[in-house]
């Protein structure tokens, strides 16, 4: 049975999950630069199958006190999608079918701007794009609180521009007495860091560069 499961999983990853190899290649290229990268494994409502997508550290925001994904009380995945993709998810019933006000959200960031410059792309207000915040949180949902007072795992999805709630879903098995949250993310680190995120070549070489500059200045002053 184990052999059959292994063969099926290999077949599924290599033949059905067409995005697996390209997404993994992108992750492995990005990882040494950033120090941290993520894979998100989930069931896609549009493709009607499991997918494994690369998520950059800029698009995966963890609460400050977290030491790992299992202990994090809030994981926010910043999802960029077109109006057509958003509409498909609304029609399928995955999101609430409510009017969404369109508009641009300021995402100015020195790192993101530099990456876009290297890629040769630039942001445009004319892009038909929505910024969706998918938050995996421990929360008290009104009328669904646990009698113990413990916050339970939910996935709350919000459109960033309009602040409209698109969905609130339970993130644990209905019959689980321990309310263990489902984990969709896998964290890859290039080198261990001082906190949640890992260190990349930019962190290491940046420090060496500053040290070399300091030593050179001291030699000149001497």
Residues covered by each model-derived region:
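Extended alpha-helical, oligomerization-prone segments that build pores/tubes and scaffolds
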Residues: 1-222
């Amino acid at each position: 049975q184990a052999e059959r499961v292994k063969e099926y999983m290999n077949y599924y990853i290599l033949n059905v999950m067409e995005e697996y190899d390209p997404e993994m290649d992108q992750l492995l290229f990005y990882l040494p630069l950033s120090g941290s990268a993520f894979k998100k494994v989930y069931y896609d409502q549009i493709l009607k199958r499991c997918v494994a997508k690369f998520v950059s550290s800029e698009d995966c925001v963890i609460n400050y006190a977290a030491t790992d994904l299992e202990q994090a009380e809030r994981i926010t995945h910043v999802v960029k999608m077109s109006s057509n993709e958003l509409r498909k998810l609304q029609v399928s019933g995955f999101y609430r079918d409510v009017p969404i006000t369109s508009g641009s959200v300021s995402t100015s960031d020195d790192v993101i701007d530099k990456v876009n410059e290297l890629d040769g792309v630039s942001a445009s207000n004319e892009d038909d794009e929505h910024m969706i915040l998918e938050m995996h949180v421990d929360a008290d949902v009104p009328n669904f609180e646990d009698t113990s007072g413990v916050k339970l795992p939910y996935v709350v999805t919000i459109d960033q521009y309009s602040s409209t709630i698109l969905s609130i879903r339970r993130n644990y098995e209905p019959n689980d007495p321990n309310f263990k949250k489902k984990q969709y993310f896998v964290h890859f680190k290039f080198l261990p860091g001082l906190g949640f995120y890992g260190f990349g070549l930019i962190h290491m070489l940046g420090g060496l560069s500053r040290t070399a500059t300091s030593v050179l200045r001291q030699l000149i002053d001497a």
